[in-house]
Amino acid sequence: MQKARIRLTGTDFNKVETVCDRIREIAERTGVNLAGPIPLPTKRLVVPIRKSPDGEGTATFDRWQMRVHKRLIDIDADERALRQLMRIQVPKDIGIEIVLES
């Protein structure tokens, strides 16, 4: 049987978890096997910016950061389950990637 590997990425931890919960509910309703959600390492992007606009004075910096949270879910590729997965409303800032594997 084929498996579907679902990779979720997003900057908001709560939104990523709600999408994971919806996928888990679909798997329970359809009765397919589910592995995950497996938390992947969080990527932390840091951008230091100099506070002073002219370069004079003390070297003080602002540090801006963005964290990208990732989850991995393996689910059996049942036709009914995949149709329901396609109907999930995913927020705009959440990336979802589905790969079918045999």
Swiss-Prot record:
One of its GO terms (cellular component) is small ribosomal subunit. GO terms for biological process: translation. It comes from Methanoregula boonei (strain DSM 21154 / JCM 14090 / 6A8). SUPFAM superfamilies: Ribosomal protein S10. InterPro entries: Ribosomal_uS10 (IPR001848), Ribosomal_uS10_CS (IPR018268), Ribosomal_uS10_dom (IPR027486), Ribosomal_uS10_dom_sf (IPR036838), Ribosomal_uS10_euk/arc (IPR005729). Belongs to the universal ribosomal protein uS10 family. PROSITE patterns: RIBOSOMAL_S10. NCBIfam families: uS10_euk_arch. Keywords: Ribonucleoprotein, Ribosomal protein. Part of the 30S ribosomal subunit. One of its GO terms (molecular function) is tRNA binding. It comes from the Archaea. The keyword Ribosomal protein applies. Gene3D superfamilies: Ribosomal protein S10 domain. This is Small ribosomal subunit protein uS10. Involved in the binding of tRNA to the ribosomes. It holds the Pfam family Ribosomal_S10. The gene is rps10.
